[in-house]
Amino acid sequence: MLPADAVNRHSCEKNLYVGVCKLTLPMKQLWWVVYIIDTVLVYLVIPFRDLLLRERPGEDCDTKGKERPLVGGDTPHSLLPPLGNSLSYADFTVKRPGRWRSPMILAHSMQRLRACFSLSSNVTLMLIRLDLWLKLRGLCVFPTYVIALSILFTMFGGVRIATLPLSLIFAFKNRPKCVMALQEATDLAKSSNVLKKVTLGLQREERGGKKGRKLRKNVKKVQQEDTSWALTVLFYLAKLVFGILGLALSIIWLLHILVFMLVNPPAFPFLNQVFIQLDSAGDLLGTTPFAIFCYYFVMSVISGEMHLGMKLLFLSIHPMK
């Protein structure tokens, strides 16, 4: 969503043809759809899926067990009205610039004040312009709280951005390896002989002209054994490759946070400058790396939720088993 939003915003700049804006995606509507789906998943589907999965076949469904999902679903709704009444308003202070005074009134006032005081330049500026500080109260809608509470997920992203690459690399390191004990060698020899006999039988049937459905089914079974082993090897090799790439992305993200986010003022734009230079060279050259970095950060947050688990009041979201 973020790369698509950035591309669509750039296509509506003033120096571009106005008709290009009509060809862009409706990003505002798409963002609302994503937020609504995320809200339904986080607050309804994920918390209460355990209540449905814990019900095993063969168990007696007593009244206490039936009331448990009702209580779990009714308690959050009973807490929402008082929380909404107490937390639905936000107080914030804004600065309202005053109007510039007319030269005639300003000169008349300055002549009268110079007779009594020796004015400095600061006092003159205070008299020229008067700034007002206003305290306003605004109504916070529900999406505001959803966006504000998303700051909690930074913990998962911070934990997993460091451990996700290492987990992938260690998964390759601790992959199943060849163990040539006597029992394993005997079992492997037996399965190899069986597979060899089946393969030779299929070859004889194919040479004899039999190409029915049964032959194709048996050939598919034999090929599936070889394919599954090849995919297993490629799966662990892919973990190693993505682990190394993820380690590089994590280091770059951490450096960007240190030099741009934690330092005030920022010491160096770093990733921002890189994306700007790539975007000036070509549209896809700037959008593709930006999408990769965003997607990696989102995957780190999701993986961190699965790795740590989180308790929201009495509801378990992504519990770690």
Curated annotation (Swiss-Prot):
GO cellular component, one term: membrane
InterPro entries: LMBR1-like_membr_prot (IPR006876)
Keywords: Membrane, Transmembrane, Transmembrane helix
Residues making up the signal peptide according to the UniProt record: none
Segments traversing the membrane: 28-48, 116-133, 139-159, 240-260, 284-304
Membrane topology recorded in Swiss-Prot or TrEMBL: Multi-pass membrane protein
Keyword Transmembrane: yes
Superkingdom, natural source: Eukaryota
Compartments it resides in: Membrane
Keyword Cell membrane: no
Protein family (similarity comment): Belongs to the LIMR family.
The name this protein goes by in its record: LIMR family protein SELMODRAFT_432210
Species annotation: Selaginella moellendorffii
